[in-house]
């Protein structure tokens, strides 16, 4: 005869599994709609400190886009990386032109070191809100310095409003 305690444990275990799966999908779907609703360019930063300060106000869905210009490549100089704001040292996404794997790996190594270096002259840092589970091709926004500053100001104003709620 089966142990009744074991049956109860199995039932509770199944209920817990189903509950965790439902929770996962609920937050996954919510995250999707929040991200799609807020999919906007938030500006370009000239220093890691400025970027980090802003990112602290918006943890979660926001990704940092590091746009590196390689002087050796005159035709197409951009190699783009997305890194989650909560784990800035872990590269998660690479978007580069075909046949540029070596260049991409070189930049990937540089990203891992960028927080230890004071000089980031060749880097432009911008912030996008994106849906983190969709690994489609994304690129850094093309903004002028004035547009970038305006976008950052708007972003900081919005962040201030949200923080005061």
From Swiss-Prot:
Protein family (similarity comment): Belongs to the asfivirus F165R family.
UniProt keyword annotations, A-Z: Host membrane, Late protein, Membrane, Transmembrane, Transmembrane helix
Induction: Expressed in the late phase of the viral replicative cycle.
Annotated membrane topology: Single-pass membrane protein
Subcellular location, record wording: Host membrane
A GO cellular-component term linked to this record: host cell membrane
Protein name: Uncharacterized protein F165R
Zinc-finger listed as a keyword: no
Superkingdom, natural source: Viruses
Stretches that traverse the bilayer: 16-36
Keyword Heme found: no
Source organism (scientific name): African swine fever virus (isolate Warthog/Namibia/Wart80/1980) (ASFV)
């Amino acid at each position: 005869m089966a142990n009744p305690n074991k049956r109860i444990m199995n039932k509770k275990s199944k209920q817990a599994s189903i509950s965790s799966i439902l929770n996962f999908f609920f937050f996954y779907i919510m995250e999707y709609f929040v991200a799609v609703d807020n999919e906007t360019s938030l500006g370009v930063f000239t220093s890691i400190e400025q970027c980090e300060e802003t990112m602290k106000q918006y943890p979660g869905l926001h990704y940092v886009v590091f746009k590196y210009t390689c002087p050796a490549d005159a035709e197409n100089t951009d190699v783009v990386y997305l890194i989650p704001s909560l784990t800035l040292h872990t590269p998660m996404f690479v978007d580069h032109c075909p046949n540029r794997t070596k260049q991409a790996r070189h930049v990937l190594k540089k990203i891992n070191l960028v927080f230890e270096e004071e000089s980031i002259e060749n880097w432009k840092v911008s912030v996008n809100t994106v849906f983190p589970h969709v690994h489609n091709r994304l690129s850094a926004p093309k903004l002028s310095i004035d547009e970038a500053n305006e976008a950052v100001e708007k972003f900081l104003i919005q962040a201030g409003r949200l923080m005061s709620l």
